[in-house]
């Protein structure tokens, strides 16, 4: 393996893609603050048992967890998702107090899953995750859905489908799981190898399998609606009424399940071009599972890479046009270089300036600035230098203006 080649399933961030990344993160962070969330950061690795307890039968633990022993033989794991670490953070730091509710936290960071790399699916991926603790009633769920809608709207992402289901509670899920196992067992040999393994421990995930979910016998499998009690059915109807009342388009999807074990109650996905771009739901039992402290909760997450992929072409053009305006300053004779190195320190108070550290001809300097992505080039020739001035050329509009050195040190000239 070439040590100068990045590992499989990860990507380098630079150029235009990094501009999109930073723009999205800035938008999301600003919006999250507006919706009352506080930012937190958790370690890249946690005790492996944290994920093994919260998602024992999920693929991210069974197959995809990056786990290892450190030099003291402690079993650790790179975080595959952010919800469980945020719960751990809130419990350990005593944020999970009733006086703090609703406690609204968000995290932006990299997650790690050992899975086969595919288009927009990486072993290291970046994710925004937000969580609300202390409530999980209809109104806080609606508020969370509206936040998700606003997030996609702020990014200019359209053409998605909102899918919703009600998983009720663990008792209901247990009954549904048993019914699915009984129903699907006669079809076991017609399932994929992965689904055959899931049939024993987690048959719900078969409904989410991209191959098996298209098969007619899977489509005809028992639905969770067959096991919902009167209260859960009423909750579903109330949610549908509220969504219709506020003109939020949705599809009620009876076979929608999430890939993580801790979800109960309402779950949802925003799907565009068959890819899930944002998803989440209620997980009322997770906090109690980890801390013995019953606390209702809900939240959602979205992958930054997938959001970038969903940006329209005109939106990407807009983002590139709003990136910081940077200038490459070139000198046409040796004596100017030493002076400009000191001057540039003052200019950088208001302007983004890079000094090219050797004498260069104008044409070569312009070609270099264009190749490196600069918006402006500053040219200092003998006449400019004697007048303590600089000629600045806009490489897009081709317009050029002469400024004094003092002007660059007093304001943004771009």
Swiss-Prot record:
Record PANTHER family: HISTIDINE--TRNA LIGASE, MITOCHONDRIAL-RELATED (PTHR43707:SF1), HISTIDYL-TRNA SYNTHETASE (PTHR43707)
Top-level lineage group: Bacteria
Keyword Transport: no
A biological process term (GO) from this entry: histidyl-tRNA aminoacylation
Alphabetic keyword roster: Aminoacyl-tRNA synthetase, ATP-binding, Cytoplasm, Ligase, Nucleotide-binding, Protein biosynthesis
GO molecular function: ATP binding; histidine-tRNA ligase activity
InterPro entries to which the protein is assigned, alphabetical: aa-tRNA-synth_II, aa-tRNA-synth_II/BPL/LPL, Anticodon-bd_dom_sf, His-tRNA-ligase, HisRS-like_core, HisRS/HisZ
Alphabetized HAMAP family for the sequence: His_tRNA_synth
An example Gene Ontology CC term for this record: cytoplasm
Family indicated by similarity: Belongs to the class-II aminoacyl-tRNA synthetase family.
Subunit details: Homodimer.
Organism (species): Mycoplasma genitalium (strain ATCC 33530 / DSM 19775 / NCTC 10195 / G37) (Mycoplasmoides genitalium)
Broadest EC class assigned to this enzyme: ligase
Reactions mediated catalytically: tRNA(His) + L-histidine + ATP = L-histidyl-tRNA(His) + AMP + diphosphate + H(+)
Protein name in the entry: Histidine--tRNA ligase
Keyword ATP-binding: yes
Annotated compartments: Cytoplasm
Enzyme Commission identifier(s): 6.1.1.21
């Amino acid at each position: 393996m070439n040590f100068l080649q990045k590992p499989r399933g990860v990507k380098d961030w630079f150029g235009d893609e990094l501009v999109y990344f930073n723009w999205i993160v800035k938008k999301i962070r600003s919006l999250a603050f507006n919706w009352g969330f506080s930012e937190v950061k958790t370690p890249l690795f946690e005790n492996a048992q944290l994920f093994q307890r919260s998602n024992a039968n999920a693929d991210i633990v069974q197959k995809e967890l990056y786990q290892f022993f450190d030099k003291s033989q402690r079993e650790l794991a790179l975080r595959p998702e952010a919800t469980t670490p945020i719960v751990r953070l809130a419990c350990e730091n005593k944020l999970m107090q009733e006086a703090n509710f609703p406690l609204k936290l968000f995290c932006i960071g990299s997650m790690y899953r050992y899975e086969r790399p595919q288009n927009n699916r990486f072993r290291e991926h970046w994710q925004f995750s937000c969580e609300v603790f202390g409530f999980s009633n209809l109104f806080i769920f609606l508020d969370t859905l509206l936040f998700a809608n606003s997030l996609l709207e702020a990014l200019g992402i359209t053409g998605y489908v909102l899918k919703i289901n009600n998983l009720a509670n663990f008792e209901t899920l247990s009954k549904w799981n048993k019914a699915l196992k009984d129903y699907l067992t006669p079809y076991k040999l017609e399932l994929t190898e992965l689904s055959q393994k899931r049939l024993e421990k987690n048959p719900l995930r078969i409904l989410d399998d991209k191959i098996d979910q298209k098969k007619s016998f899977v489509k005809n499998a028992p639905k969770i609606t067959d096991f919902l009690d009167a209260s859960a059915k009423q909750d579903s109807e109330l949610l549908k009424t509220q969504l219709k009342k506020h003109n939020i388009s949705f599809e009620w999807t009876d076979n929608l399940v999430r890939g993580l074990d801790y979800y109960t109650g309402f779950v949802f996905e925003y799907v565009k071009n068959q890819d899930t771009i944002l998803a989440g739901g209620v997980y009322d039992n997770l906090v109690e599972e980890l801390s013995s402290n019953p606390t209702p909760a809900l939240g959602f997450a979205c992958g930054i890479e997938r959001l970038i992929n969903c940006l329209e072409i005109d939106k990407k053009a807009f983002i590139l046009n709003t990136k910081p305006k940077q200038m490459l300053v070139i000198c046409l004779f040796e004596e100017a270089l030493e002076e400009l190195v000191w001057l540039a320190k003052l200019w950088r108070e208001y302007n983004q300036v890079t000094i090219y550290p050797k004498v260069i001809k104008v044409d070569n300097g312009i070609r270099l600035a264009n190749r490196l992505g600069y918006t402006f080039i500053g040219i200092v020739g003998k006449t400019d230098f004697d007048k303590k001035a600089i000629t600045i050329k806009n490489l897009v509009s081709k317009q050029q203006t002469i400024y004094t050195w003092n002007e660059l040190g007093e304001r943004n000239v771009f």
